């Protein structure tokens, strides 16, 4: 991948080159509505950018370096690295503050004896629709990838136990999600990690349903969420043909 990028940079140094992660982050950026979400995207983008800085410097070095001198590429690489490290540190520091605030909120809920439910699932599976139905809220529902980036918390009353329960809607997952993205969004995903119950929303009309269920379950394993907490919620049953419904039943 980096060899191909170097060829592009050598021909047109100012050209923008995106890989799969860049594309995902570009979509994320369109849906970021809070400072925390924006910082998480920036951190993931910088983590993905880091390995490329050396390659960019090598291209510039071949273009402007001379024998026995420090090439212009080497100088630029050092400058880019320093700038990259400073940005990374700033983003991590700000996210650490957000994570601390979120932990205080979760600890406060626990001290009050409030139980929590987290809604997870593959992107565009219908998590926010379920959240709206359960909480009677009207958060934006889109037929789009990654429409939810932030963790939104609401509450529902459970007559059977006579208590209110908190419920959170979280970011949608995707196959082959890079570890850097999971790490960057860790503070948001903490709502799921500390939840008493995790509702795994599944689009039952999706031909790739089985594979996507496996993707979500794998990410939950990475987050060390016990399987005992996970409950499947099948969505979009109305979009399944009658014959398929018979097979499912």
Provide a role label for each language-model segment.
Residues 1-16, 158-164, 185-249:
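Conserved C-terminal guanine-recognition region of P-loop GTPase G domains, centered on the G4
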Residues 102, 109-115, 134-166, 174-187, ...:
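Switch I (effector-binding) loop of TRAFAC-class P-loop GTPase G-domains
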Residues 1-116:
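Conserved P-loop NTPase architecture
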Residues 84, 130, 149:
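Conserved hydrophobic/aromatic pocket- or pore-lining residues that grip, position, or stack substrates
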Residues 122-140:
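A conserved segment at the C-terminal end of the G1
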Residues 25, 173-174:
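A short, flexible beta-alpha/helix-coil linker loop
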Residues 169:
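Conserved active-site aspartate in kinases
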């Amino acid at each position: 991948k980096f060899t191909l990028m170097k060829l592009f940079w050598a021909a047109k140094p100012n050209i923008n080159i995106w890989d799969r992660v860049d594309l995902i982050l570009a979509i994320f950026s369109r849906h970021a509505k809070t400072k925390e979400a924006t910082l998480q995207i920036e951190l993931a983008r910088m983590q993905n950018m880091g390995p490329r800085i050396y390659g960019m410097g090598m291209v510039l070095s071949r273009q402007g370096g001379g024998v026995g001198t420090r090439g212009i590429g080497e100088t630029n690489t050092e400058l880019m690295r320093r700038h990259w490290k400073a940005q990374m540190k700033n983003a991590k520091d700000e996210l650490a503050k957000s994570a601390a605030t979120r932990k205080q909120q979760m600890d406060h809920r626990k001290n009050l004896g409030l139980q929590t439910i987290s809604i997870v699932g593959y992107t565009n599976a219908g998590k926010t629709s379920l959240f709206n139905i359960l909480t009677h809220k009207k958060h934006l529902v889109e037929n789009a990838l990654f429409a939810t980036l932030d963790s939104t918390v609401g509450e529902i009353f459970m007559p059977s136990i006579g208590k209110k329960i908190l419920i959170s809607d979280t970011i949608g997952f995707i196959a082959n999600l890079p570890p850097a993205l999971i790490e960057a969004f860790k503070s948001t995903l903490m709502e799921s990690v500390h939840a008493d119950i995790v509702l795994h929303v599944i689009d039952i009309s999706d031909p790739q349903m089985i594979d996507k269920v496996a993707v979500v379950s794998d990410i939950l394993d990475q987050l060390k969420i016990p399987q005992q907490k996970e409950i499947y919620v099948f969505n979009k049953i109305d979009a399944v043909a009658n014959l398929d419904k018979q097979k499912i039943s």
